[in-house]
From Swiss-Prot:
GO terms for cellular component: cytosol. It comes from Methanosarcina mazei (strain ATCC BAA-159 / DSM 3647 / Goe1 / Go1 / JCM 11833 / OCM 88). It catalyses: carbamoyl phosphate + L-aspartate = N-carbamoyl-L-aspartate + phosphate + H(+). Pathway: Pyrimidine metabolism; UMP biosynthesis via de novo pathway; (S)-dihydroorotate from bicarbonate: step 2/3. This is Aspartate carbamoyltransferase catalytic subunit. Carbamoyl phosphate binds at R58, T59, R108, H136, Q139, L268, P269.
Amino acid sequence: MMLFKNRHVISMKDFSREEIDYILDIAEKLEPVARGEERSRLLDGKIISLLFFEPSTRTRLSFEVATRRLGGQVLSLGSVEASSVMKGENLADTIRVISKYADLIVLRHPLDGSARMATEFAAVPVINGGDGSVHHPTQTFLDLYTIRRESHLEGLKIAMAGDLKYGRTVHSLCYALSLYGAEMTFVSPPELRMPREIVRELRKKNIRVKESECLEEIIGDIEVLYMTRVQRERFPDPQEYEKVKNKLKITGDLLKSADPELKILHPLPRVNEISPDVDDTPHARYFEQAFYGVPIRMALLALTIGVIE
């Protein structure tokens, strides 16, 4: 029996394939509620605290929608500037206090490892909404859900492109897809390559890994293209960002060489790495992908609070 009640959601490495599949199954059952076609009171009387120390649109709003669709209430930090953090309060004390107010904490923080550290001081479950450039497990769960709904997971041929050095979404996704025997191609400028330790770990698991600097070389050989933006905020040197920001771009012309069934995903926000003329093609699934964050986060909230087993 899989136990999720009071469990923290910090890294994909904390979950087995069987547990991931179960979470995806629960999300699928909750999708009619996420779409407003059915009503639910699973989180009636529960308070979910959203502690976001970095900007967020989709993650934050989808957690709010997920909570409200399940009948719960949201306790949200308006801004870091308006909080006691600006007075010097440390994260540990903030977590201790918010644990007294809420039944679960969703934390986004710029420091690597901050979510794991928060669990040491929390009296309630903590869900990692993204910490530094390392982990973003709820994004990975929704990416897996999207791939399963739009294509398939087992033996998937996928390319991840863009900022593979700083992109926490691709780091988490690599591990998760390795559980399904995916074939992975990494496309990026040399400066933004996938970290070598991740590539080594994948190859130790006998996962087929290729690397390229050119989308044209690989576009006809893949089933899913996972595109990411170059993350300007992670660059210590702005000039280095300027050198690489426009190196990779998906256009309608490029897609003429793609498999007709190719699906394009993007964790959003995008900058200019996907041309607007791609949006109305059958390949573009990134807006539906953003919606899938709602049923996935509903499932994670319900399971960790313990209203679903």
